[in-house]
Amino acid sequence: MRIVFLFFIFFSFSIQSQTLDYVFKSGEDGYKCFRIPTILKSQNGTLLAFAEGRKNSCSDTGDIDLVLKKSLDNGNTWSALNVIWDDGNNTCGNPSPVLDKKSGRISLLSTWNKGEDKEWQIIDQKVLILGEFF
């Protein structure tokens, strides 16, 4: 019983001492919401946080940009939001950064489709332009 009591005291203290900070927060920087976040640590230690910036809704279709924030202090603070790909009302999504450890080069793989294309149309290949990968 004593061990359980001490566990709860420690657990309660641990929860209370943590602060919660978001890299991307819905409703900020002109975006309704952010989805598909991913973080990569460069060879010089810079953290790069990528996400989809969804302008008008949290839907998987529509005006979606790729956005980036950087941290030089291991995530304690973050830069202002940078838009790295905005193709008007089209969907630029699924950011997937890859680090080449030999060269230090970072490649960002992503997808693109027309903003009015619905998910079921893309899956059934019923769109004029099939999604592109970059």
Language model segments and positions:
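Sec-dependent N-terminal signal peptides
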Residues: I3-F13
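Asp-box/BNR beta-propeller blade signature and adjacent active/binding-site loops
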Residues: Q16-F134
